[in-house]
């Protein structure tokens, strides 16, 4: 990271930023092309490591790319706001507040029904703040759930 003065390294502070984010952009490599998709997500923390959970249709480009090459990049951000810190009539008089997390990891499908249910519970809890969901078994069977085991991540904040 070029701006070390903006880097957040404390795992608790990084996860506090993740907690404020509600959309994660996943980047896939598709035969030399880049495919990026914004997704709602949930996460699970184990010390300084994270697992991100997502859901979607069982077929489509995401699922094909996970099967083909599980390596992914991700980005999430929160608190974006452009404001003036100087002369309001000069473009360079503006800057932006934000907090962001970027990283890489390996994506895989979740097949086990209990893990799938737990992953959806985590995702829904992060998205709407509620736990103890009832899942219709037909819907559970119809949805694809996948996870990204985060291998590297960095966090940046600018106030």
Predicted regions and their residues:
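Extreme N-terminal tail/first-helix region
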Residues: 1-19
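A generic structural signal for short beta-strands and their flanking turns/coil linkers
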Residues: 22-24, 37, 48-50, 68-72, ...
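Short Pro/Gly-enriched beta-strand edge/turn motifs at strand-loop
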Residues: 8-10, 20-25, 129-131
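General beta-strand recognition
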Residues: 51-53, 73, 147, 154
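Charged, gly/pro-rich active-site loop segments
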Residues: 2-5, 80-159
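Helix-adjacent hinge/juxtasegments
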Residues: 61-85, 92-93
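Short beta-strand segments
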Residues: 21-58
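Residue-level recognition of well-ordered beta-strand positions that form the cores
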Residues: 40-42, 75, 106, 149
């Amino acid at each position: 990271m070029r701006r070390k003065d903006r880097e957040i390294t404390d795992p608790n502070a990084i996860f506090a930023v993740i907690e404020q984010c509600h959309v994660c952009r996943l980047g896939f490599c598709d035969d030399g092309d880049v495919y990026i998709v914004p997704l709602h997500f949930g996460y699970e923390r184990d010390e300084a490591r994270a697992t991100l959970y997502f859901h979607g249709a069982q077929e489509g480009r995401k699922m094909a790319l996970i099967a083909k090459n599980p390596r992914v990049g991700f980005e999430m951000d929160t608190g974006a706001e452009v404001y003036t810190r100087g002369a309001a009539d000069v473009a360079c008089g503006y800057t932006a507040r934000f907090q962001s997390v970027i990283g890489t990891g390996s994506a895989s499908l979740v097949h086990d029904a209990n893990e799938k249910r737990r992953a959806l519970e985590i995702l829904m809890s992060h998205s709407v703040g509620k736990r103890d969901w009832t899942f219709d078994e037909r819907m559970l069977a119809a949805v694809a759930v996948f996870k990204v085991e985060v291998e590297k991540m960095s966090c940046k904040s600018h106030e």
